[in-house]
């Protein structure tokens, strides 16, 4: 019988509607696992009860520390219940900083615990099954959601009526038992602290945008800025000039990385503005959404790794 630890952090999976109709975390871990009828020895750690929009990088460290404590206590696998708003960031940070062999599986819900057809119990049951499965060993951090097992790298939240929750690279399925059908990339960068990682900001690009927001981020201490660019990685002349100032002309160059506001799109320098961004000193992040490009840059800078090499390998 597998020994598993469930670490709760809040999120929709733990929420119910109050008298005012507002959803807030109310369910503890013991309530979440009640009635799941799992053939495992399950310990619960109620770490937080937060909407994931309130989480900070310091909370990623708290979650990572709780995972390590569970493994020191003899857990064979860990499941983390998490809000879907920022699950893609937490999952990637953990994957970038966890080198262990025992599985860490994140899950959550699209519907509150008191909603008709709530998806939380099934998602949690599936995540526990993945964490207990010998095939998940040595895969590091996984996401189990909506009947699928997903790789954290490249994951992004989507709104679908089938409650799948996320788009990303599928590693397998959980319907009718756990089936892992693909190998997984483990983008480990080191045992890093998110709370002390260099500041990385995200700046939106839009018609008529200029470099004011980028300048403000750099003035506030950002070591890197992710541009949420247009299309396949494009921006106007004022933004390109701002990139040149910060990457080429300054005495203390800043990393400017280019992602896109188009969900699931690949970024490249195929169009004139994208080509000009690269010539100005920006680096393209071909596959990651802005949220995850930021996390990857935080980890790369914290590890003192060459950013271009890290992006070329995992971005």
Swiss-Prot record:
Residues forming the catalytic site: 12
InterPro entries listed in its UniProt record: AsnASE_II, Asp/glu_Ase-like_sf, Asparaginase/glutaminase-like, Asparaginase/glutaminase_AS1, Asparaginase/glutaminase_AS2, Asparaginase_C, L-asparaginase_C, L-asparaginase_N
UniProt pH dependence: Optimum pH is 8.0. Retains about 40% activity at pH 5.5.
Temperature note: Optimum temperature is 37 degrees Celsius. Shows maximal activity between 30 and 40 degrees Celsius.
Protein keywords: Hydrolase, Secreted
Reactions performed catalytically: L-asparagine + H2O = L-aspartate + NH4(+)
Origin: domain of life: Bacteria
Residues that bind substrate: 52-53, 84-85
A Pfam family annotated for this UniProt entry: Asparaginase_C
GO cellular component terms attached to this protein's record: extracellular region
Name of the protein described by the UniProt record: L-asparaginase
Organism name: Mycobacterium tuberculosis (strain ATCC 25618 / H37Rv)
């Amino acid at each position: 019988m597998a020994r598993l630890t469930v670490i709760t952090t809040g999120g929709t999976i733990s929420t119910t509607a109050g008298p005012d109709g507002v959803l807030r975390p109310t369910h503890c871990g013991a309530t979440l696992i009640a009635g799941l009828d799992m053939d495992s020895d399950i310990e619960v750690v109620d770490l937080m009860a937060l909407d994931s929009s309130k989480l900070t990088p310091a909370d990623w460290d708290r979650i990572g520390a709780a995972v390590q404590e569970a493994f020191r206590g003899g857990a064979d696998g860990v499941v983390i219940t998490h809000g879907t708003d920022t699950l893609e960031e937490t999952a990637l940070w953990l994957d970038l900083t966890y080198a262990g062999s025992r599985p860490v599986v994140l899950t959550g819900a699209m519907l509150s615990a008191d909603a008709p057809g709530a998806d939380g119990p099934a998602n949690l049951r599936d995540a526990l099954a993945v964490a207990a499965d010998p095939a998940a060993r040595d895969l590091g951090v996984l996401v189990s959601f909506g009947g699928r097992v997903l790789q954290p790298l490249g994951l992004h939240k989507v709104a679908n009526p089938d409650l799948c929750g996320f788009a990303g690279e599928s590693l397998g399925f959980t319907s009718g038992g756990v089936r892992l059908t693909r190998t997984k990339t483990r983008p480990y960068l080191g045992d890093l602290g998110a709370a002390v990682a260099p500041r990385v900001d995200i700046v939106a690009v839009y018609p008529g945008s200029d470099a004011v927001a980028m300048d403000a981020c750099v003035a506030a201490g950002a070591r890197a800025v992710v541009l949420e660019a247009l299309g396949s990685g494009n921006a106007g002349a004022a933004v390109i000039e701002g990139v040149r100032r910060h990457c080429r002309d300054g005495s203390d160059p800043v990393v400017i990385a280019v992602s896109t506001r188009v969900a699931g799109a690949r970024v490249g320098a195929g169009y004139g503005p994208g080509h000009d961004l690269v010539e100005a000193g920006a680096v393209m992040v071909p596959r990651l959404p802005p949220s995850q490009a930021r996390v990857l840059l935080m980890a790369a800078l914290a590890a003192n790794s060459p950013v271009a090499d890290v992006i070329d390998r995992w971005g």
